[in-house]
Design a protein with these regions (language model features):
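C-terminal peripheral helix-coil segments that are non-catalytic and often amphipathic
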Residues: 1-21, 115-118, 122, 152-168, ...
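Short coil/turn segments at alpha/beta junctions that flank glycine-rich nucleotide-binding fingerprints
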Residues: 47-51, 102, 123, 168
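Helix-turn-helix
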Residues: 2, 36, 40, 44-78, ...
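Amphipathic alpha-helical segments used for helix-helix packing
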Residues: 108, 121-145, 195-202
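Hydrophobic alpha-helical connector segments
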Residues: 96-128, 148-151, 155, 177-181, ...
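Short, basic, alpha-helical segments at the C-terminal edge of helix-turn-helix-like DNA-binding modules
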Residues: 85-90
Length: 235
């Protein structure tokens, strides 16, 4: 006697998982939307400043509905602060990736100075946003705890590099990390933020590759000559 196999219900099929379940896909879409919004916000705020930037233009650049801007970031001010944090975060992450602790102190410092110059050269939006924020007395960055927290690891890395250099007899002992970094950043920042006026005043095209290379060498040599115990010994 044959045993009958129970018939399967007509129309039922075994569910095959798709590339991503709806909740996962939604999370990915939300992350992509937020990233597009931040990129558009950085571009708009860098171009027009906080006061001149328009939320509807940011939405247009991001390719989304204007209401989604408020859904994800609440207000123009919140979006601006997020954009400001994002440009700082990118810089700090790239600085940490330099792995200065793996290099000899002088070599590490040369690498950091060169990186700082190159970063400003290729990120004019960073310069524009910082200039605008300082024009507004730093009102959006003051008290921003995430920004303070992200700076601490970099300062500690710079302090460790200085201490190693002092211990090796390479660096002067009267430099502190924060003042040194302000000098490194300030020398390059002034050059790029005032490049057009400096070019006009001195009658030189300071934005050419040759001019940038010459300035980069000068910034490194100028800083290292003040930091080294024996400037003749670069590494």
């Amino acid at each position: 006697m044959k045993t009958k196999t129970p018939a399967t219900r007509q129309g039922t099929r075994t569910r095959t998982a798709g590339p991503a379940d709806p909740p996962t896909r939604a999370r990915r879409d939300a992350a992509a939307t937020r990233a597009a919004l931040l990129a558009a916000a950085v571009a708009e705020f860098a171009r027009h400043g906080y006061a001149g930037a328009r939320v509807d233009e940011i939405a247009k650049l991001a390719g989304i509905n204007k209401q989604l801007v408020y859904h994800y970031y609440g207000s123009k001010e919140d979006l601006y602060q997020a954009a400001l944090e994002s440009v700082y975060t990118e810089l700090r992450e790239k600085e940490r990736s330099l792995s200065l602790g793996e290099l000899q102190p002088a070599e590490a410092m040369v690498k950091l100075i060169g990186f700082s110059f190159d970063y400003l050269s290729t990120h004019p939006e960073f310069i524009s946003m910082l200039t605008d924020e300082n024009r507004n007395q730093g009102q959006h960055i003051t008290g921003a705890k995430p920004l303070r927290a992200m700076h601490r690891p970099f300062v500690e890395m710079l302090e460790a590099t200085l201490e190693r250099g002092v211990a090796a007899g390479t660096f002067r002992a009267d430099y502190d990390a924060i003042n040194l970094y302000i000098s490194i950043a300030g020398i390059s920042y002034f050059f790029f933020s005032n490049n057009h006026t400096l070019s006009a005043i001195f009658g030189k095209r300071l934005h050419t590759k040759a001019a940038l290379a010459q300035r980069r060498r000068h910034v490194i040599e100028f800083t290292m000559n003040s930091l080294l115990v024996d400037p003749a010994r670069k590494t």
